[in-house]
């Protein structure tokens, strides 16, 4: 491919899925250009690595490109897409470009409605500790690597497989993981859950005869498709019939401790005593997927144990910002940020927080993501949002969707008040959320910002605002001059 295609342009290069692929292509020696509406940490990193990143979208940005990569978030009337069509420059969906990268190595694809990013990160970390030096493309920043992508020298590439637009059906990996199957992105599947499950079955059919499907049998929908998977299967979870099974799991000081029983290839492997540097039973399941793959690839047990104990997490996945002073300066609260935006994953994260911080007041600042999801999961949102001790509710982050009547932040607020479980505070402008958090937070609270939209910028703004207050106080204490 390289002798024909040398210059690759990304429309929306700062996106989580796009930036990782762009970084790997840069490291492979391609010339990469891209455009995005604004600057971000991802675009700054790509620029430092040698990419040319332009702000805004304009037809001239595609001049000289041999291929133009787009995600499903890019509309067909985008001026760069229109210019590429006019010039007969191939327009390549993001998933197709990822599939091309997988052709260069042996692919490990992580699919599922929830937990893809964390599971992908755990798999990459365990394989790296085992000396396999994988390439990875992740939808979040792997803290230990300081990036969401890396070109390794080993045989494997580990990547997320996105079911939201059915693009995971473009991939042909040798190992697949399905963490769970839930009702999300239902517009893609005509609001037919059977079609969504069928897509996951078809995903397993992409495996070669020597491939492996690693399936979480704790999930009832994954268990339901099990009879239709024709390739070799490794079952993992807490269930008694799991081949890679966790027992005696418990939360200890914000981590999870558990024992892993493995029955693979007709014989029992030695039990593993695991300390996972993440909270929550859902993360135990995610770790089991990584353990199953690592065991199949003969990663030494000591490397598995070490990687999970030292795992430093992923950006915006239960990311701890530390202890922040309260507005009155008389106390401190724990600030955590999480990408969760579906009721199921939100419930898992909140349960993990309760386990990690027992007895403490839990304050949630939540920004719903997409009007369609808010509409489709409205009652489930009401249930999960009613489980916290205090709630700050932002307006829906549209992600390009038009508003839907009775599926916005105000509608959720009204429904929560009618339910009577909690008295939410509606924060109409996300710019006001940092101050709303400081007004609400009390000493010893655990405050979680949650959502897939612009709320991800809020924790840093809270920390920065309190740092400015402390700096001003230092000036006052020193008679008007900073020490």
Curated annotation (Swiss-Prot):
GO molecular-function term, one example from the UniProt record: ATP binding
Source superkingdom: Bacteria
InterPro entries referenced in this protein's UniProt entry, alphabetically: Mur-like_cat_sf, Mur_ligase_C, Mur_ligase_C_dom_sf, Mur_ligase_cen, Mur_ligase_N, MurCDEF_pg_biosynth, UDP-N-AcMur_Ala_ligase_MurC
Catalysed reactions, as listed in the record: UDP-N-acetyl-alpha-D-muramate + L-alanine + ATP = UDP-N-acetyl-alpha-D-muramoyl-L-alanine + ADP + phosphate + H(+)
Main localisation: cytoplasm
A cellular-component GO term for this protein: cytoplasm
Keyword Mitochondrion on entry: no
SUPFAM superfamilies: MurCD N-terminal domain (SSF51984), MurD-like peptide ligases, catalytic domain (SSF53623), MurD-like peptide ligases, peptide-binding domain (SSF53244)
Residues holding ATP: 112-118
Subcellular location: Cytoplasm
PANTHER family membership: UDP-N-ACETYLMURAMATE--L-ALANINE LIGASE (PTHR43445:SF3), UDP-N-ACETYLMURAMATE--L-ALANINE LIGASE-RELATED (PTHR43445)
Entry function: Cell wall formation.
Protein name per its UniProtKB record: UDP-N-acetylmuramate--L-alanine ligase
Lineage: Bacteria, Pseudomonadati, Pseudomonadota, Betaproteobacteria, Burkholderiales
């Amino acid at each position: 491919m390289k002798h024909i295609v040398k210059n690759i342009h990304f429309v929306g290069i700062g996106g989580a899925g796009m930036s990782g692929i762009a970084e790997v292509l840069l490291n492979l020696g391609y010339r990469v250009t891209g455009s995005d509406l604004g600057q971000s940490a991802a675009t700054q990193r790509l620029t430092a690595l040698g990419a040319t990143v332009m702000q805004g979208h304009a037809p001239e940005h595609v001049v000289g490109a041999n291929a133009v990569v787009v995600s499903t978030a890019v509309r067909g009337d985008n001026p760069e897409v229109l210019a590429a069509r006019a010039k007969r420059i191939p327009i390549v969906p993001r998933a197709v470009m990822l599939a091309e990268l997988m052709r260069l190595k042996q692919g490990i694809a992580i699919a599922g409605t929830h937990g893809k990013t964390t599971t992908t990160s755990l798999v990459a970390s365990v394989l790296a500790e085992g000396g396999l030096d994988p390439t990875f493309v992740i939808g979040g920043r792997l803290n230990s690597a300081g990036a969401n992508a890396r070109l390794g020298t080993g045989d494997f590439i580990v990547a997320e497989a996105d079911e939201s637009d059915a693009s995971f059906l473009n991939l042909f990996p040798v190992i697949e993981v399905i963490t769970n199957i839930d009702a999300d992105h239902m517009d893609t599947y005509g609001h037919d859950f059977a079609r969504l499950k069928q897509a996951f079955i078809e995903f397993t059919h992409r495996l070669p005869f020597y491939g492996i499907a690693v399936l979480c049998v704790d999930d009832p929908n994954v268990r339901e498709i099990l009879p239709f998977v024709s390739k070799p299967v490794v079952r993992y979870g807490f269930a008694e019939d799991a081949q890679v099974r966790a027992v005696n799991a418990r939360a200890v000081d914000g981590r999870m401790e558990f024992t892993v029983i493995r029955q693979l290839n007709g014989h029992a492997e030695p039990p593993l005593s695991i300390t996972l540097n993440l909270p929550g039973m859902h993360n135990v399941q995610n770790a089991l997927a990584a353990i199953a793959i690592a065991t199949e690839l003969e990663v030494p047990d000591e490397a598995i144990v070490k990687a999970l104990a030292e795992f430093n997490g992923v950006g915006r996945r239960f990311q701890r910002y530390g202890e922040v002073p309260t507005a009155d300066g008389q106390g401190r609260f724990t600030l955590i940020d999480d990408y969760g935006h579906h009721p199921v994953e939100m419930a898992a994260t909140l349960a993990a927080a309760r386990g990690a911080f027992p007895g403490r007041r839990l304050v949630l600042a939540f920004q719903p993501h997409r009007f369609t999801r808010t509409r489709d999961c409205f009652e489930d949102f009401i249930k999960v949002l009613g489980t916290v001790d205090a709630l700050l509710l932002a307006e829906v982050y549209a992600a390009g969707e038009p508003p839907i009547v009775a599926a916005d932040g105000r509608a959720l607020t009204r429904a929560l008040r009618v339910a009577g479980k909690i008295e939410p505070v509606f924060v109409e402008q996300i710019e006001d959320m940092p101050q709303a958090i400081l007004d609400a937070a009390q000493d010893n609270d655990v405050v979680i910002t949650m959502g897939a939209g612009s709320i991800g910028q809020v924790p840093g703004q809270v920390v920065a605002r309190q740092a400015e207050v402390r700096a001003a106080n230092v000036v006052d204490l020193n008679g008007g001059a900073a020490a």
